[in-house]
Amino acid sequence: MSMFLDQVTIDVKAGKGGDGMVAFRREKYVPDGGPAGGDGGRGGDVVLVVEEGLRTLMDFRFNRHFKATPGENGMSKGMHGRGSEDLLVKVPPGTTVRDAETGALIGDLIENGQTLVVAKGGRGGRGNIRFASPRNPAPEIAENGEPGQERKIELELKVLADVGLVGFPSVGKSTLLSVISSARPKIGAYHFTTLVPNLGMVTTSDGRSFAAADLPGLIEGASQGVGLGTQFLRHIERTRVILHVIDMSGMEGRDPYEDYLAINKELASHNLRLMERPQIIVANKMDMPEAEENLAKFKEQLAKERTDEYADELPIFPISGVTRKGIEPLLNATADLLEVTPEFPLYEDEVVEEETVRYGFQPEGPEFTIDREPDASWVLSGEKLEKLFEMTNFDHDETVMRFARQLRGMGVDEALRARGAKDGDIVRIGNFEFEFVE
């Protein structure tokens, strides 16, 4: 049996930008050639791409680390490094993407060919050509490439189907799907024969078509994780119409009406919005003895429990998946209902990460933090400060002096002095150590 994987956490790391170069023009008859170090190339992004042929996240079972290539370093004679190609990671349609640490929604990928950048590549470092000025016409200053974005993301697959077949185990959902489509799900006379969602394309007698999904059987407590639990309840979220399949034969000693209430309770417990979707009750196994009697009793109980006398009655279609009796009217009614039912947005209250740039003042957190270690050294940290540190090329004295000026401009010296730092104290940024000088 092919394995079905519908939730996975992966690590993505974009490519680092290429380093800028310190170089000078050295040619015969050009005594004052000046700086000639080129810029580094842009690092590659990590991009998710929807691939229509994929149906599961199985490809991520053994490969969960994705790293884009860095940009090319700058070269002499003013030549810039080449930007790296993006790393394309294929995902099936219906994949939602979240930040694993914050839980924030990054994107919802549903259309073939749709792309989503999940990690941005770093920009290339500037070569010494960029730092030339009248005051310093021959600078020995160049930047390292900017680090690429690194993050953990969660991929969650929710199958794309117009119609979802729900019900208790062994009520005949898989048999029904095999009859109305070309899908060939595993069918057996025991509970939980279906362990993965099965998709099938259904065509009605008048030529209309829709996608239907046979979802694994639910049991009481599924919304709290009992049985197959929430693992497959999520797949119902994308459906527009629910076919609620009920075993009317009562052969296992079950009450059809109690089954109906129990399944609806699980749907509501998982997500209240599932109850907004229109339902069609499929009274299955009508070829069995006592099925007619059970159906009449079911209709009686359903009418008795109606709270709104003006609400439309739920459509009930008696069928037999084995003899195929009543199948055609059911499919036509389902297609009719789909034509008037809109799509239900999955994430109305959540804001998807935007790729557009908004200009304007945005208050930021502190640019750096200072901590005191037990060995009396000082540790500097902070996203902006660490980024400056990583983009500094310490092989050239001028670049080191520039970094010192940047720290002073950020107020690091003043803050250290205010915390009690004295001449000769050790200051650390990452693995780098230097002495504090007043």
Swiss-Prot record:
GTP binds at residues 167-174, 192-196, 214-217, 284-287, 320-322. InterPro entries: G_OBG, GTP-bd, GTP-bd_Obg/CgtA, GTP-bd_prot_GTP1/OBG_C_sf, GTP1-OBG_CS, GTP1_OBG_dom, GTP1_OBG_dom_sf, OBG_GTPase. PROSITE patterns: G_OBG, GTP1_OBG, OBG, OCT. Residues 2-160 form the Obg domain. It is found in: Cytoplasm. Residues 161-339 form the OBG-type G domain. Mg(2+) binds at residues 174, 194. Pfam families: DUF1967 (PF09269), GTP1_OBG (PF01018), MMR_HSR1 (PF01926). Its EC number is 3.6.5.-. An essential GTPase which binds GTP, GDP and possibly (p)ppGpp with moderate affinity, with high nucleotide exchange rates and a fairly low GTP hydrolysis rate. Plays a role in control of the cell cycle, stress response, ribosome biogenesis and in those bacteria that undergo differentiation, in morphogenesis control. Monomer. Belongs to the TRAFAC class OBG-HflX-like GTPase superfamily. OBG GTPase family. This is GTPase Obg. It comes from Enterococcus faecalis (strain ATCC 700802 / V583).
